[in-house]
Amino acid sequence: MKANIHPDYHKITVVMTDGSQYTTRSTWGKEGDVLNLDIDPRTHPAWTGGSQTLVDHGGRISKFKNRFGNLGM
């Protein structure tokens, strides 16, 4: 196996949408960083059986609809 080709694993804190926290090892960020989740398994419609609503991060869905909305069937 080649040496020094794998990313560094370190401990981060993950904060769920309800405020609960847990510590895990990850390649994301730096040691001690905090990852705040916008959606997690406790609130995601695929896992809760709730309504299928879309979260428009940065207006991406709106931008897509404006660009391709007139191509309706």
From Swiss-Prot:
SUPFAM superfamilies per UniProt: L28p-like
InterPro entries associated with the record: Ribosomal_bL28/bL31-like_sf (IPR034704), Ribosomal_bL31 (IPR002150), Ribosomal_bL31_A (IPR027491), Ribosomal_bL31_sf (IPR042105)
GO molecular function ontology, one term from the record: structural constituent of ribosome
PROSITE patterns referenced in this protein's UniProt entry, alphabetically: RIBOSOMAL_L31
Recorded superkingdom: Bacteria
GO cellular component terms, semicolon-separated: ribonucleoprotein complex; ribosome
Gene Ontology process terms (BP): translation
Keywords carried by this UniProt record: Ribonucleoprotein, Ribosomal protein, RNA-binding, rRNA-binding
Alphabetical list of PANTHER family matching this protein: 50S RIBOSOMAL PROTEIN L31, CHLOROPLASTIC (PTHR33280), LARGE RIBOSOMAL SUBUNIT PROTEIN BL31A (PTHR33280:SF6)
Family: Belongs to the bacterial ribosomal protein bL31 family. Type A subfamily.
Description of how the protein assembles with itself and partners: Part of the 50S ribosomal subunit.
Function according to Swiss-Prot or TrEMBL: Binds the 23S rRNA.
Name used for this protein in its record: Large ribosomal subunit protein bL31
Organism: Bartonella henselae (strain ATCC 49882 / DSM 28221 / CCUG 30454 / Houston 1)
